[in-house]
Amino acid sequence: MDYKTAGVDVQAGRAFIERIRSSVEATHRPEVIGGLGGFGGLIRLPAGLNKPLLVAGTDGVGTKLELAQQHQAHYGVGLDLVGMCVNDVITSGAEPLFFLDYIATGTLSPEAMAQVVEGIAEGCRRSGCALLGGETAEMPGFYDPGCYDLAGFCVAVVEEDEMIDGRKIKPGDQIIGVASSGVHSNGFSLVRKVLALTEANKNTRFGCDNKPLIETLLTPTTLYGQLVRNLLEAKVPLHGMAHITGGGLPENLPRCCPKDLVTVIDPSSWTRPELFQWLQDAGQIPEHDLWHTFNLGVGFCLVVAEEAVRDVLQVCKEQALQAWPIGQVETASPSTGERLRGLPS
């Protein structure tokens, strides 16, 4: 008996590394030292920083992976993985510096895994960060054949005196919602229950435009890193930012705001995408649960002074991203402890 008989194909692993090499190295910034193959990735801090802070984040893609694996949508979940991590760390105004990935699988499929890593590499390229290293663990008997899980790790850098942490947010500031591409990577345990209930398949269509349901659900997470970079380069004064993930607006927007302030949202200020209405109707999901599970069309929020709204909307337009003023910041009432108002209770 040998290792391959036990379920681990070392030769397939080597072929996989060679397949992804060019995609990975194409993400490398000038600060990267060396290439693939070392025990650890090496990178210098960007030149010219005085008091740099490192910002780290980690995340996965959740049970969206099951749907993606059923429909061989491997490239897209690579983009999702980067989006989930990068969109978190940029909320502090940090520049994504490098990314690491971890892939665990039952049996290594070089083609599927290469598509995943190529998606990760493309997400890193769009976000300006180096794919500095990763681990692909073949674990036969632990994961079913063809099944895999993903984890991502992103490190970003920001000057200490330029960090955005919500301290500048004040009453009267406006909240800009930036469009999501769909469900992104949260709420898929509920999505999968709805799909099972309705017996939906790859041929199922929905909405006025008769869109393919599964393809729409698997649309990759929007990457907001370039938008934030452009806003910072344009010297737009950003007071706070929030990545709208699990928990939706109610649980994520207040995270960027001081506790003595309340965010007030007007749900009529943007049009809820048809996909969420289909999910609600098909699954008979209560309105409260819908808001606390999905982004409902708003994937990222920017908190800015009122006079900066026009500039923010212009930069979003130049990035081909829809955006809307969706609310404002007010003084909180000490007696209620409310952090967010305006949404259905």
From Swiss-Prot:
EC number: 6.3.3.1
Subcellular location: Cytoplasm
The UniProt record lists the keyword Disulfide bond: no
Gene Ontology cellular-component annotations: cytosol
Keywords annotated in UniProt: ATP-binding, Cytoplasm, Ligase, Nucleotide-binding, Purine biosynthesis
Pfam families (UniProt xref): AIRS, AIRS_C
Chief localization: cytoplasm
Family statement: Belongs to the AIR synthase family.
PANTHER family: TRIFUNCTIONAL PURINE BIOSYNTHETIC PROTEIN ADENOSINE-3, TRIFUNCTIONAL PURINE BIOSYNTHETIC PROTEIN ADENOSINE-3-RELATED
UniProt protein name: Phosphoribosylformylglycinamidine cyclo-ligase
Naturally occurring in which organism (per UniProt): Prochlorococcus marinus (strain MIT 9303)
